[in-house]
Amino acid sequence: MDRIIKLVETLERPGTAEVLQYLKDSNFKDIHGGASHHKYKGGLIDHSLEVYEAMKKKTEGKGSPSDSVIVCSIFHDLGKTISQSGHYGKSVGILDRCGFELTEDERNAILNHHEVLPEDLNVLAPTNLGTYLKKSDMLSTGQYKFSTGRVKNKSLSKKIFNYLLLAWAKS
């Protein structure tokens, strides 16, 4: 949880203090990542940090603001503190209630990171930020499709995750 807090503390936006307090007061540190991945206490933290590492690696030198990478990766599943289903809308709702200012690209990326869309027609999250969040999330959950097929292991070891991350970042 310390790393999550340190990343969020770097954000210089209205509502940051309120979101930090929400993170500390909520069950964020205790809940699992999802029904089929990171299924252990603290799994959501590990998943969020994996998504952050993947987005950071993929966006280096590509013009995505580093604060947007932090916002999308760390907050995309914030709504799971309320409910596992429909959490993306709840994530944005929590941020709105905290007075945290999201850019339009960040809001769209978080709201649509679970949409199943054709690779060439990412209509709901048309920015690179939305694409990077969706693919980073899929990489962390073991659902990312590579040219050799879909990764099916739902509990990727850190070593395998890092290998896949390097391969994806180079693509």
Regions found by a protein language model. Name each.
Residues 48, 52-55, 68, 87-121:
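Histidine- and acidic-residue-rich, metal-dependent catalytic cores
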Residues 60, 79, 83, 96-100, ...:
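Hydrophobic/aromatic-lined pockets within catalytic cores
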Residues 84-97, 122, 156-170:
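Divalent-cation-assisted or electrostatically stabilized phosphate/pyrophosphate-binding catalytic cores
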Residues 1-83:
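Acidic/His-rich, divalent-metal-binding segments that scaffold phosphate/diphosphate chemistry
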Residues 1-14, 54, 141-142, 152-171:
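Histidine-centered, transition-metal-coordinating active-site segments
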Residues 101-154:
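Histidine/acidic-rich helix-loop-helix segments that form or flank divalent-metal centers
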Residues 44, 67, 84, 88, ...:
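Short capping loops/turns at secondary-structure boundaries
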